Amino acid sequence: MLQTSVRKPINVVVWGENRHEQTDPSIAARYPDGMHGAIKQGIEEYLGGGASVSTVTLDDPEHGLTEELLAATDVLLWWGHAAHEEVDDEVVERVHRHVLAGLGLIVLHSGHFSKIFKKLMGTSCSLRWRGETDRELVWTIDPTHPITTGVPHPLIIDSQEMYGEFFDIPAPDELVFISSFGGGEVFRSGCTWKRGHGRIFFFSPGDQEYPVYFQPAIRRVIANAVEWAVTSRPERTSPQLSRVYSGEFFPEFDPDGNAIKGTVAI
C-alpha cells in the first residue's frame, strides 16, 4: 500500500513595526488590524491550513523575537519603516543567526532599510523614492519561478509610492520582478538571495499610505514567497568551519563542527 506523508503546516511569523497604526488615524483606519494583521490574513487566505501564522510587533518584549519563537519558525516576514533604530542589536544578531541556519526571511517595502536586511546584504540598501501617489507596474522577469505562480503580468498597483534605482544591494541570486513607475523610473522590486542555509526574498510594494496588502495579487506573491522560503533540513544549524583529514569522507563532527578523526574512513 502506498504510504503518503502529510506535510506539517509552515510556521510563519509576521513581524510588524506597528507604529504608524498607533500614531496616524488614517493608517489605523486603513489597516484596522495593523499592517502585520493584513499580511497575516493574506497568507492565511492563500495557504489555508498549509500555514500556521502569528504576528509579533516591535513593542513586544524582545520585539517578540525570542530564541524559542525563532527556533520554531520556518519563515519570518518583516515590515518596518519609522523605527529601524529601535530594534535591539541583540535581537538582530539572533535573527541573523537563525537565517544563516535556515530560517526563511521575507523583507517587505521599507524593511529594505532595517538592521537585519542591511546586515544580511552587507550594503547600505539605500534607494531613491518619491512620496507621491504613483502607478506601479510589477513586471515578472522569471515566469518559471515559483514566487510568480498565479501572478498577473504585469501586476498593477494603481496607487503606490515610487521606489527607484540605484538600489544599493548585492546582485540578487534571482531577479523575480522589476517595477516601473509613472516618472519613468524602474526598480528591482522582487529579489532573492541565499545566506548560509537561509532563503531571503525582498518585495518592495507595500507603503503604509495605500491599501496594498489587501490586493489579491500582492497577497498571492507573499503567500508564494512563504512556500518558497522554507528550507527542509534535519535540524537548524549554521554552516561551520570544519577541519577534515586525508582519507576520510563525510566524517562525524564534534559540537564545534570539527571532524572527528578516525570516523567513516575510506
Language-model segments: residues:
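Catalytic beta-strand/loop cores that center a nucleophilic Ser/Cys/Thr
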Residues: 51-52, 71, 127-204, 238-239, ...
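Basic/polar N-terminal segments that are highly enriched at the extreme N-terminus
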Residues: 1-10, 38, 42-46, 261-266
